Design a protein with these regions (language model features):
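Acidic beta-strand-loop-alpha-helix segment within the catalytic core
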Residues: 4-92
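Alpha-to-beta junction loops
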Residues: 96-101
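N-terminal glycine/serine-rich phosphate-binding loop of ATP-dependent small-molecule kinases
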Residues: 1
Length: 101
């Protein structure tokens, strides 16, 4: 599970925070500050999405809510690895460059 906090100013998102207590991982990003990850007792690390590898995509999938539509779409792609994940962690894995889609 995760705790998610966002700040919107005048209809524009300016800050986002995702904390995963079981892993003690904190992800955050802010306008003009970039995106960051902090592991337990670690210093902040800048994170960024990646360019997919030519040999296939790394896919994060819902652990508890499979979708026939998503499966049909994914079947059209070359997939190198599947990572089951839950809640907002899927978005964090994309943001840190662990997964492609």
């Amino acid at each position: 599970f995760t705790v998610n906090i966002g700040l919107i100013e005048h209809g524009v998102p300016v800050l986002g925070v995702i904390y995963a207590p079981p892993q003690n991982l904190l992800y955050y990003g802010a306008k003009k500050l970039g995106a960051w990850r902090e592991k337990e007792k670690g210093k902040p690390e800048a994170i960024h999405a990646r360019i997919p590898a030519a040999d296939g995509l790394v896919v994060v999938r819902s652990r508890s809510h499979p979708s026939k539509i998503a499966e049909a779409f994914l079947n059209t792609l070359t997939i190198k690895e599947n990572i089951p994940s839950s809640s907002s962690m899927k978005l964090c894995l994309l943001a840190e460059g662990t997964a492609d889609i």
